[in-house]
Curated annotation (Swiss-Prot):
It comes from Ruminiclostridium cellulolyticum (strain ATCC 35319 / DSM 5812 / JCM 6584 / H10) (Clostridium cellulolyticum). The keyword Zinc does not apply. It comes from the Bacteria. Residues 554-613 form the KH domain. Its cofactor is Mg(2+). Belongs to the polyribonucleotide nucleotidyltransferase family. It catalyses: RNA(n+1) + phosphate = RNA(n) + a ribonucleoside 5'-diphosphate. The gene is pnp. GO terms for biological process: mRNA catabolic process; RNA processing. GO terms for molecular function: 3'-5'-RNA exonuclease activity; magnesium ion binding; polyribonucleotide nucleotidyltransferase activity; RNA binding. It is found in: Cytoplasm. Residues 623-691 form the S1 motif domain. InterPro entries: ExoRNase_PH_dom1, ExoRNase_PH_dom2, ExoRNase_PH_dom2_sf, KH_dom, KH_dom_type_1, KH_dom_type_1_sf, NA-bd_OB-fold, PNPase. This is Polyribonucleotide nucleotidyltransferase. SMART domains: KH, S1.
Length: 703
């Protein structure tokens, strides 16, 4: 049965419609937020998937270009693979809902959000997040929700809930926040060096709005929600776990306390073989369940050690960072490079400087724009000791690259100050946790090595969490998580920023949410960590950006011309600009507002091209004298090029003081002569006089 529900969200009406569309899904809803419309659905398989040890959830955010009245480009004329923005939005929706499903559920669950109409003032990502929450909550799929979501902006010191397009352009931060009525489940932020306390207060304000959304969704569930289905738990049988625990607990404790990752993995692997052999007769054909029990035991040992001993399995204090090191100038031919190491995590980042014509064009359902600063993140198999081939970036790689990108954008000089495009690439060479934050630190090193005048160094670090499952009020937060603490812990709270404030946040959790106190502690830990990394490591490796760019980096000269003169510089069919490029060997980019960028490693060539362009763009005025080149001779005079692409006629009567019988008696093609502009007629033709120029030259000499 069709039902419609509405609430006010940030001064605009949010409407949820159920019981009409996509009725074969387990749950579905149409979300209207202003003129933004999202179709959200949640579907579960009838039976669990065999042979897996994880919850098979997929979340998709599908952009349709008809939502903004566009026809896709290219030959096929239909949407292709998801855009980077769509992938990142899928991840933002996935992270707050995933921890709220039962951990032992093995039925496939697919959540699909289709963007059908977009009004730029009303964020489709928030409408999709709320839509996903509604679709799952009213379905029969087990779920400990609902969640709500908002975007936070900061304009003139005021926190704005779901800022419109104009407010987003002015905002010092863009924070996507999600949570249940009781706790925060997801934070994704980009900020212009916002102090930690300001960010914390904004999160608390945003949560107040989220509580209203959760109440709204709970009201919908009461009216149209289905009873949740029962499922077969995939958890380890209690009797098996007790036997495995009795046999392997002490050995597992010894194994996980090995400080070296490879040594620890080897000991755990050996213990697995011993346990399988010892229990094979008692539990026949239960090899996979024994492995699951050992995994559960390893997790228990790691968590107990942190909670009870108050320190880490590698011997560190809770607020202690692993051994740090940093180097710059690793690769001689790149424009800049930096190597950052934190324990057994090692990231090499390079920077390549390019012309403004190298910026990335972003053409999707958002307002068309360009991206000048790009960061790509690579995570090869060898970084974790695995023999596997690379199949291109997945969602994780794209997400980590975007996080590192957001972290550095606030400190990049403006286009006016430094007219370059940037491409950074982070190669993860070793991974034992927190590679995305290693990429942030590597980016700072590479940019400073390249001579980019960044506003301040940026560092990134993560905070971890272990909550006592029997007493949730007992928890421990700690700084700089390594891989095993990420696997078995409850939180990966990544924060990047300068010594003055935050530039990016990404929060992943495995529990049903975080209290304000946990978030406060995470902010304090990561702030301390940022300061230590910047002051003790980055600034000791390279105290300030290099004064000069790499000799292999292109040099850019900029100038401004009248936009009306752009067509003259380009010429018919690009003839003039191609001629300049051929003569000088430079690369030229021209913006619509008349900004011209000349890029080349050869400064002399750049100056030559600049002179030509300025000459073309210059207005020719009657009375001016030019040194021009004879380019064509006729019976009635000579055509002289006085500026690139601009020539005028010197009539035979104006060639000399005395009478001239034949043009060739005075000038030849290729001669350079002084000429004076006598007239520009109504048709734009330029009349020149050599005779007047000679007379003017003589007058000057006499003076």
């Amino acid at each position: 049965m069709f039902k419609s529900f509405s609430m006010e969200l940030a001064g605009r009406t949010l409407t949820v419609e159920t019981g009409k569309l996509a009725q074969l899904a387990n749950g579905s809803a149409l979300i209207r937020y202003g003129d933004t419309v999202i179709m959200s659905s949640a579907t579960a398989s009838a039976a669990p998937r065999d042979g897996i040890d994880f919850f098979p959830l997929s979340v998709d955010y599908e952009e349709r270009l008809y939502a903004v009245g566009k026809i896709p480009g290219g030959f096929i004329k239909r949407e292709g693979k998801p855009s980077e923005k769509a992938i990142l939005t899928s991840r933002v929706i996935d992270r707050p809902i995933r921890p709220l499903f039962p951990k032992d559920l093995r039925n496939d669950v697919a959540v699909v959000n289709t963007v059908m109409s977009v009004e730029q003032d009303n964020s489709p990502e928030i409408a999709a997040m709320i839509g996903a929450s509604v679709a799952i909550s009213i379905s029969d799929i087990p779920f400990n929700g609902p969640i709500g979501g908002v975007v936070l902006g900061l304009v003139d010191g005021e926190v704005i809930i779901n800022p419109n397009e104009e407010q987003r352009a002015k905002s010092k931060m863009y924070v996507t926040l999600a949570g249940t009525k009781e706790k925060i489940t997801m934070i994704e932020a980009g900020a212009d060096i916002v102090p930690d306390d300001v960010m914390f207060d904004a999160i608390k304000k945003g949560h107040e709005e989220i509580k209203k959304i959760c109440d709204f969704i709970n009201g919908i569930v009461k009216e149209v929600g289905k009873a949740k289905f029962t499922y077969e738990s995939a958890d380890v049988p209690a009797d098996l776990f007790e036997v495995v625990k009795e046999f392997a607990y002490d050995k597992m404790r010894i194994a996980v306390l090995a400080t070296d990752k490879q040594d620890r993995d080897a000991k755990v692997s050996q213990l697995t073989e011993e346990t399988q052999a010892a229990l094979a007769e008692q539990f026949p054909e239960m090899e996979s369940k024994i492995n699951d029990a050992l995994y559960k035991l390893e997790k228990k040992v790691v968590r107990e050690y942190i909670l009870k001993e108050g320190k880490r399995i590698d011997g560190r204090r809770l607020d202690e960072i692993r051994t740090l090191s940093a180097e710059v100038g690793i690769l001689p031919r790149t424009h800049g490079s930096g190597l950052f190491e934190r324990g057994q995590t090692q990231v090499l980042t390079t920077v390549t400087l390019g012309a403004m014509g190298d910026v990335q064009m972003l053409d999707g359902i958002d307002t068309e724009e360009t991206k000048r600063y790009m960061h790509h993140y690579n995570f090869p198999g060898y970084s974790v000791g695995e023999a596997k081939t690379s199949r291109g970036p997945g969602r994780r790689e794209i997400g980590h690259g975007a996080l590192a990108e957001r972290s550095l954008v606030p400190v990049i000089p403006t286009e006016t100050e430094f007219p370059y495009a940037f491409r950074l690439v982070s190669e993860v060479l070793m991974s034992n946790g927190s590679t995305s934050q290693g990429s942030v630190c590597g980016s700072t090193l590479a940019l400073m090595d390249a001579g980019v005048p960044i506003k301040a160094p940026v560092a990134g670090i993560s905070a971890g969490l272990v909550i006592d499952e029997e007493n949730p009020d007992n928890f421990v937060t700690f700084m700089d998580i390594q891989g095993i603490e990420d696997f078995f812990g409850d939180m990966d709270f990544k924060v990047a920023g300068t010594t003055e404030g935050i530039t990016a946040i990404q929060m992943d959790i495995k529990v049903d949410g975080l209290s304000y106190e946990i978030i406060r502690q995470a902010f304090e830990l990561t702030r301390m960590g940022r300061l230590q990394i910047i002051n003790d490591v980055i600034l000791k490796a390279i105290p300030q950006p290099r004064k000069e760019l790499s000799e292999y980096a292109p040099k850019i000269i900029t100038t401004n011309i009248d936009p009306e003169k752009i067509r003259d510089v380009i010429g018919p069919g690009g003839k003039m600009i191609n001629k300049i490029i051929a003569e000088t060997g430079v690369k030229i980019d021209i913006e619509e507002d008349g900004r011209v960028y000349i890029l080349t490693p050869d400064s002399a060539a750049a100056q030559k091209a600049l002179k030509i362009i300025q000459g073309i763009a210059k207005d020719i005025e009657p009375g001016e004298v030019y040194l021009g080149k004879v380019v064509r001779i006729t019976t009635f005079g000579a055509f002289v090029e006085i500026l690139p692409g601009k020539d005028g006629l010197v009539h035979i009567s104006k060639l000399d003081k005395k009478r001239v019988e034949k043009v060739e008696d005075v000038v030849s093609i290729g001669d350079e002569i002084l000429v004076k502009v006598t007239e520009i007629d109504k048709q734009g033709r330029i009349n020149l006089s050599r005779k007047d120029a000679m007379a003017e030259e003589n007058t000057t000499e006499e003076k």
